[in-house]
Regions:
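Conserved Radical SAM active-site core
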Residues: 1-84, 91, 98-104, 263-295
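Auxiliary alpha/beta "docking" domains used to position bulky ligands
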Residues: 55-56, 159-163
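Surface-exposed cleft-lining segments at the edges of enzyme active sites
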Residues: 80-88, 116-126, 161-169
Length: 295
């Protein structure tokens, strides 16, 4: 299996020490978000690769050489300020972290996500064009692939409409973004791609590809993986991964996040984290049913 660490919360940013404790002990327990009494026990001997997804990869860097599994990084890096990404650290530090990671695991294993693209009076198309070009310039030689997506109508987006103040992205916006982003990427030796987007931007120079394709999964593990996206009803063809995260436990508090939408619950869960526990949040009870997961 390939571990997703994590699409539900930013384990790398806030819980790296816990993850390394689990790695050293050889297993991790994951509570089923839809049936909380069920717990999957995952042994790292059954793990073929690890995909780290984070807005702040800095805390995990010191541990990377200890991890004897193939690693992929998806690092989200946008031009948004604290009004949208409330607790995300200084972007200059993140960029330096990306460079360090690229040197450690290789440029082909590091993906940057400019994600999601949203338009309002502050974050105009012109703003994004300039921010994306600056990003490409700073990461030239350290990143080959940048993934973009456009904002989706998640629960948290609806709850934060007073903050986001979204404007509709029309075809003219898509064309300008596509042409300008593609030009910036090419000038800095990168490829810009989309995944699970209904709009076809290939005519503007984007590549339609998957965040974790069957080809890439085979390259890093030597195994064939079936398509197993949880994003039903989309054009996503990413391979199946196993997420070990926990919803509503990320203190980044990004206004557009799909996985963290209850601020009170986020604070409670964060306080219920124990770095020595086998679970990310909380502890195992007598009523829990633990089953080993192999794939």
């Amino acid at each position: 299996m390939i571990l997703n660490v994590s699409g539900r919360t930013d384990i790398v940013a806030f819980y790296s020490e816990w993850f390394m404790n689990r790695y050293k002990e050889g297993f991790v327990d994951v509570r089923n978000p839809f049936n909380p009494s069920l717990i999957s026990r995952i042994y790292f001997e059954d793990v073929d690769a690890i995909m780290f997804c984070s807005k702040n990869p800095l805390p995990i860097i010191e541990y990377l050489k200890e991890i004897k599994k193939p690693i992929i990084f998806h690092i989200t890096l946008t031009g948004y300020k604290r009004d949208i990404e409330k607790n995300v650290p200084n972007k200059k530090e993140i960029i330096e972290g990306i460079k360090r990671i690229s040197k450690i695991i290789g440029i082909d294993r590091v993906f940057v996500r400019y994600d999601p693209v949203l338009i309002n009076e502050e974050y105009t198309v012109d703003y994004h064009v300039k921010a994306f070009d600056k990003l490409c310039e700073k990461l030239d030689g350290y990143v080959k692939n940048i993934i973009i997506s456009f904002i989706d109508d998640y629960k948290n987006v609806q709850n934060n409409m007073n903050i986001l103040k979204l404007k509709t992205i029309d075809n003219n916006d898509l064309e300008r973004i596509g042409i300008c982003f593609s030009d910036s990427a090419k000038r800095h030796n990168m490829m810009v791609q989309t995944c699970a987007e209904d709009d076809n931007l290939t005519e503007y120079g984007f590549t339609k590809n998957d965040c974790l394709s069957q080809r890439l999964a085979f390259e890093i593990t030597g195994k064939d993986y079936k398509i197993g996206t949880i994003r039903k009803g989309t054009s996503c063809n990413c391979v199946e991964t196993v997420d070990i995260g926990y919803y509503n436990s990320c203190p980044h508090m990004c206004a557009y996040c799909y996985a963290n939408y209850n601020e009170k619950e986020i604070k409670t869960n964060y306080l219920n984290h124990n770095k020595t526990s086998s679970l990310l949040i909380g502890k195992i009870t007598e009523k829990d049913i633990i089953k080993r997961r192999y794939k």
